Amino acid sequence: MDDLENNIFNSVEEEILYWKSVAMKYKQCSEEAQQELQEFQEASREYEAELEAQLLQTEGRNRDLFSENNRLRMELDAIKEKYEEQHSENYVQISTLEGDLSQTKAVRDQLQKYIRELEQANDDLERAKRATIMSLEDFEQRLNQAIERNAFLENELDEKENLLESVQRLKDEARDLRQELAVQQKQEKPKSNMVSPETERMDTSVQASIAIPSAPLTPLSQRGCASTLTSPLSFRTSLDDGYSGTPLTPCARISALNIVGDLLRKVGALESKLASCRNFVHEQSPNRPLTSVSARMKKTREGIENRLSIASGSSVEKGLIKRLEFGSFPSNTPMQGMHSPQGVVKMII
């Protein structure tokens, strides 16, 4: 405006034209501003509509998000409750499992200790088993030896019983033949008074051999007659001939006394064996009675001593008694000891 007031016009028309041009200019500016205002209003209405639509959309979305937030919050609360519950349950379960684990470790330690003890006991049992097996084998070996020894001793006892039976039979025959002897003495008194001095000397030697049975008589004068009695058959034949009534020769008598001495020595050895067997069996089975064996041995020895004491009588009876004691049995007596290791006594039995 100051610029306009400072203008100097030359005429009124120039001033009017000037002011007209200025009015036109401002009018054009006003129209442009009005147009811009309308455009701005239209754009503002469009923006407002868009903003309202966006606001509505945002509000709807906000409501959805709020509801979703509420739902998620509720889910979170439920999950928290479930987590707390699960955590408490897990804590209890973990505590229980820890207790079970400690108990299991204690049981495992006890079982390991028990296994070590069982292994040690197993080793001890194996050593004891080996020792027992060795002792059992030793015991079986000793038992087999004892069984063999008992069987051998039982065989000897059976042989001894057979010997006792034969001795009893000989005693019976001796009793019968004594009666016959009494009859023959009445019939043969002249013959009994004609005994030669040589026969008396031989009877004296027979009595000496009876007194010491452990030392058999083997003088030079008897070697020839002893050679004739080496075989059981010849000795048996000579003894059978003794029953025919002819007296025994001095050689036969001395051989018979030697056999009696051998018999006594063998009986003594058998008694020592039976005594050792009795001690062994007493150690194995203390309750087994052995008095019968010792009694029978005693009776056998007494019987043999009685026969020897009878044999030391008169010179006439000695030959007949030797024939009775070492003579042949009847034909029905079995020859069961011909090959026995007991010698001539078994051959007689």
From Swiss-Prot:
Q: Which Gene3D superfamilies match?
A: 6.10.250.1080
Which is an annotated Pfam family here? NUDE_C
Instruction: Give compartment(s).
Output: Cytoplasm, Cytoskeleton; Cytoplasm, Cytoskeleton, Microtubule organizing center, Centrosome; Cytoplasm, Cytoskeleton, Spindle; Chromosome, Centromere, Kinetochore
Question: Which source organism does the UniProt entry give?
Answer: Xenopus laevis (African clawed frog)
The family line of this record is:
Belongs to the nudE family.
Share the record's PTM remark: Phosphorylated in mitosis.
Q: Name one GO biological process term.
A: mitotic centrosome separation
Complexes and interactors: Self-associates. Interacts with pafah1b1.
Question: Which InterPro entries does the protein's record reference?
Answer: NUDE (IPR033494), NUDE_dom (IPR006964)
Give the record's keywords alphabetically.
Cell cycle, Cell division, Centromere, Chromosome, Coiled coil, Cytoplasm, Cytoplasmic vesicle, Cytoskeleton, Kinetochore, Membrane, Microtubule, Mitosis, Phosphoprotein
What protein does this entry describe?
Answer: Nuclear distribution protein nudE homolog 1-A
GO terms assigned for molecular function: microtubule binding
PANTHER family per UniProt? NUCLEAR DISTRIBUTION PROTEIN NUDE HOMOLOG 1
This chain's function reads:
Required for centrosome duplication and formation and function of the mitotic spindle.
Gene that encodes it: nde1-a
The terms describing its cellular component in GO are: centrosome; cleavage furrow; cytoplasmic vesicle membrane; kinesin complex; kinetochore; microtubule; spindle pole centrosome
Coiled-coil positions: 22-189
Q: Does the keyword Coiled coil apply?
A: yes
